[in-house]
Amino acid sequence: MRNTIKSTNSLAGYFLVSTLQMPDSRFAGQVVYVCSHNSNGALGLVINKPDCNLSFAQVLREMGMEVSRAELPSVYIGGPVSLDAAFVLYRSHPYEGNHIDITDNISLSREKELLELVVGENSSRNYLFLVGYVGWESGQLELELRDNSWLVVPGDEQVIFDLPDGEKWKAAAAYYGIDITTFNENLGYA
């Protein structure tokens, strides 16, 4: 039986690109992919922050899985909340287990069986493995948006899966032709 939830919430599938006005230094230069957003709050994953101290092979071994591939992808810090929670953000394919279809092309799961499929693939360009997430209570994200902490742009699977991590922040903002390194949304009025 396929348990699929189609996410249709307002900012699900969008990027939150941190601006220079971001007051929380943990998110400076970060791109968050919003997976769920509704009246109860929001959940997102930082897509450009690999953890150099944690190897994917180590995580798999701790889960009791065999590791046969020599080259495995990075583990990303998806956010500061629940660093013991693991997620797979992936280009959609006919996975039958529990997952959320965020868009027609991008899905999210926490299932161990999906990890086994992912490890068997030849390309790590179809998924990100993340620990932790970014969470907002009801109304909290909206306040951050009003404070110009985030630039909201449509999510793009090429930015998530194909670009080097160091290019994702600028590339996501460039969707609107913005140079995020000089972007200042605080306007003066005469």
Curated annotation (Swiss-Prot):
Pfam families xref list: DUF179 (PF02622)
GO cellular component terms attached to this protein's record: cytosol
InterPro entries: AlgH-like
Gene3D superfamilies tied to this protein: VC0467-like (3.40.1740.10)
Extent of the signal sequence: none
HAMAP family recorded: UPF0301
Family, as annotated: Belongs to the UPF0301 (AlgH) family.
Protein name according to UniProt: UPF0301 protein DP2218
Organism: Desulfotalea psychrophila (strain LSv54 / DSM 12343)
